[in-house]
Amino acid sequence: MISAKMVKDLREKTGAGMMDCKKALTECDGDLEKAVEVLREKGLAAAAKKSGRVAAEGIVSTYISEDMKNGSIVEFNCETDFVSVNELFVELANNLSKQAAFSNVSTAEELLEEKYIADESKLVKDVITELIAKLGENMNLRRIAKLSVDKGVITSYIHGGGRIGVLVKLACEKEDAKLAEIAKDVAMQVAATNPLFLNRDGVDTDTLEKEKEIYRVQALNEGKPEKVVEKMVMGRINKYYKENCLVEQLWVKNGDYTITKYLQEQSKEIGADITVEAFVRYEKGEGIEKKEEDFAEEVQRQMNQGK
């Protein structure tokens, strides 16, 4: 006899629907653990069907250690805005960023194979698969990154409820409470302006030569004499640096300052040099090609799923 309590226990353990739980228990003669396995197998099959669908929504989540010496950032994708704000989805994303901070792995693929920080009886990939089955959408841990510092701080900034996330590494020989505020300013700058590089040294040769060639052709097309073209090219390259290198950008909170000048002013106040050593900026779904569907196609897909 399958009791209501047995169904309730199985539902709480798996998140599956009530009728699915009752069928699984009946199939397994009331054996709870076997019923869990049956539902997991069915859940895995359902998840496999969903894995081909584009997951371009989701959130960016960050985690900063209490001493602000370590930080991590992850992008965790789903298919719709609706699921991206689901409590279970957000909780998993936040746990994944926390796990990344304390893990020795450096890629999302490696993190998927680790034991889950909130339940070490399961692997991260299996926890994600279970949530796919429960919420009915494909999900993907797309990427992770970590920063650490010995002297200085790591901080983060999240914009738009997880649409954009930033990690910043600030180095300073002197420990000062104000460093966290300064790092937050820099992180907000990165979120707002999306710099491509930290400084000029970070601009790779291929990118630089490509930009120079574009500016050279532009100058020649403007009918400028050959002898002044090179000077114009260098002027435009300097402008490129100022727009795309973080430390040369104008500070969004005060256009009279570049980020370098802002850090120099703060260094004087603290009494020690402050430098930005690294940053990471994630924007959810960037670079993912979304499949466009018209309304009729969407209705047909839902009807097919219901068969």
From Swiss-Prot:
Localization of this protein: Cytoplasm
Keywords: Cytoplasm, Elongation factor, Protein biosynthesis
PROSITE patterns in UniProt: EF_TS_1
Family matches, as Pfam families: EF_TS
Region (Involved in Mg(2+) ion dislocation from EF-Tu): 80-83
Molecular functions (GO terms): translation elongation factor activity
Presence of the UniProt keyword Protein biosynthesis in the record: yes
Cell membrane listed as a keyword: no
One biological process term in Gene Ontology: translational elongation
A Gene Ontology cellular-component term: cytoplasm
InterPro entries: EF-Ts_dimer_sf, Transl_elong_EFTs/EF1B, Transl_elong_EFTs/EF1B_dimer, Transl_elong_Ts_CS, UBA-like_sf
PANTHER family per UniProt: ELONGATION FACTOR TS (PTHR11741), ELONGATION FACTOR TS, MITOCHONDRIAL (PTHR11741:SF0)
Family statement: Belongs to the EF-Ts family.
Stated role: Associates with the EF-Tu.GDP complex and induces the exchange of GDP to GTP. It remains bound to the aminoacyl-tRNA.EF-Tu.GTP complex up to the GTP hydrolysis stage on the ribosome.
Name by which UniProt lists this protein: Elongation factor Ts
